[in-house]
Every structure is written in C-alpha cells, then in structure tokens.
C-alpha cells in the first residue's frame, strides 16, 4: 500500500481578504464615529494594505474594524502582519502585509516538532514554501495534524491534499 500524505501550507484566499477590505471600507464611510476623521483602508500593492486616519486612536479603531471583518471571513489574524502606526504630516498611516508561505526557519521548527513529538514512521519534507508529511498509517497523519494545531508557530497553517 502506498504512503498516505498531506501538505502543510500557509495561504490566504485573496478574494476573501478583498471582500473583508471592502466591507471594512464601507463601514468606515458609514459609521458615525468615523465621520470627518479621514479614515480609509485600501490595497497598496499585491500583499500590502494601508490604513489612514487623522488620529492614532481612529487609526487603531479602523484596524480593529478590519480585523473583525477578517475574522468573520474565517481568515486567521496570523495571516495579517500589521505594522506600527506612523505619522506623516497630519495623517497617521499603518501598513500591513499578508503573510503567505512557510519560511524556512518555521518549516524547520515544524519538522523538528514532528520528528520529536510525532508518531514513529512519519516523514516531513520541506518543498519550497510548503511541507509534505507522509506516513504508512492515516491515523498517524491525523495525530500529526492535531499536534500541529495545538502548537503556535506564529503563522496560519492549513492542511491540504490529504491522500
């Protein structure tokens, strides 16, 4: 019998992020406490989202609105890395990036965790920005999934291609 396997990836559905961004932008224009504060949210590039507001408090409130919309769309907040608010003239700006892909150091941490605490006979291979986990037994793979879900690696993990 062939080995069973699955892939560990860290990807974000760009369309869902776009929907969350548009919902947040609409809420910023219609909510009473954001009137005349210059609060806005927009894409600036492929992976970067920029928030603007007149005061730092309104900027952080706009960030909370955006995070709430991400949560409602089932997007992990670990996938959005918000920077620090910076003042640019009279306007406060905050740039955040979408975190996609598993970095090499995180991949090494995950493989070490699987090797040390996972069931025997489970192999983990780094393949670019994803990780392939394989074993003869499917039960071992499910044990690895629950092991990885219980650990915090600082990134949003998804488990795909379960065969």
UniProtKB/Swiss-Prot annotation:
The keyword Cell membrane does not apply. One of its GO terms (molecular function) is nucleotide binding. One of its GO terms (cellular component) is cytosol. It holds the Pfam family DUF520. InterPro entries: DUF520 (IPR007551), UPF0234-like_C (IPR035571), UPF0234_N (IPR035570), YajQ-like_sf (IPR036183). It comes from the Bacteria. Keywords: Nucleotide-binding. The keyword tRNA-binding does not apply. Belongs to the YajQ family. Nucleotide-binding protein. This is Nucleotide-binding protein RER_17110.
């Amino acid at each position: 019998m062939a080995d069973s396997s699955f892939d560990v990836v860290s990807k974000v559905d760009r369309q869902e992020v776009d929907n969350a961004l548009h919902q947040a932008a609409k809420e910023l224009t219609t909510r009473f406490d954001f009137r005349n504060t210059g609060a806005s949210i927009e894409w600036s590039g492929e992976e970067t989202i920029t928030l603007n507001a007149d005061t730092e408090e309104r900027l952080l409130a706009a960030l909370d609105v955006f995070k709430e919309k991400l949560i409602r769309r089932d997007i992990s907040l670990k996938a959005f890395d918000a920077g620090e608010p910076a003042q640019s003239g009279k306007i406060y700006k905050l740039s955040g990036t979408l975190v996609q892909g598993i970095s090499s150091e995180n991949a090494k941490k995950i493989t070490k965790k699987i090797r040390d605490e996972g069931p025997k006979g489970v192999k983990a291979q780094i393949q670019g920005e994803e990780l392939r986990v394989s074993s003869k037994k499917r039960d071992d793979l499910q044990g690895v999934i629950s092991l990885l879900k219980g650990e915090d690696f600082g990134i949003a993990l998804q488990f795909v291609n379960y065969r």
